[in-house]
Amino acid sequence: MNCPIFLWRIYKYIVHLFTGRSEIERICYNIELKSLDRLALIETSVDYSKQLVHIKKDMKSEFDPGDVAIKIVEIKGFNQELLAFDSIILPNLISALEPISLFQGLKKSIEKKQKIPYDNNNLEHEASLERLWEALLPDVRRSARLSKEWGTLGFQGMDPATDFRGMGILGLDNLIYFSTQHSEDAREILKNSNSKCCYPFAITGINITALVLNLIDKPHFKIYFFKNGSTLTQFNELYSLVFISFDRFYQSKKPKSIMEFNTIKKEFETKISQNSDLVQLLRN
């Protein structure tokens, strides 16, 4: 919002006085608005509304769009006569709230995965780790489960389990998705990471998971999910896009040694944290 909040509230009051409708009611009534624009305007209106403080709190986690829509109608005092005969206001409000609820549900699922630690005694975890190896190095067989050969994939020690402490099983899931669904890109990046100006593929991938998590509430990240769907698959797709973009960015800097890695990584983080078209930003 480009103007001070108090000026915005004065503006809303004057418009409400002349139209007899609240801001959200006007947004929902405007049939010329695109769905994403309506969603963004309603989200902003809720954020800056003194009356909807509890609604804002409810919308910080997964919620029932229909229930929240009814509460907004009651709190904001929508014109009940118009509401009774108008078939677009309430449906438009509910449809704008649905993507927000789905996004919060996705965040909950992601956080749940992040909190699951890698367990060497969990057969599913061990099988997933083997799947990662096979996806990236299908023609290479390791000498043992605990081996320095894991360093080829960019893990720090003989047991990759220790590298997943911060991101849990989510970090492994992201690496597997990228390595299986974008195998050509993943193998090319692995090759790049083992070149003269190398960086650890797996550790970098886990850092990319942390980066996407840290930025997920940025407006342009949220818009990505609102457009494409708030699913784990789309989270994995975004992760893959960020990883590919990072490698291109890193290679374009032509680093002379691995000592430049952290500086380049910070530059990249600054770049994608900007409020802009995320997909276009990553493809440039």
Curated annotation (Swiss-Prot):
A Pfam family of this chain: ELMO_CED12
Species this chain originates from: Dictyostelium discoideum
PROSITE patterns associated with the record: ELMO (PS51335)
Molecular function (Gene Ontology), one example: GTPase activator activity
Official protein name in the record: ELMO domain-containing protein B
Residue stretches in coiled coil: none
InterPro entries: ELMO_dom, ELMO_domain-containing
Domain ELMO: 124-276
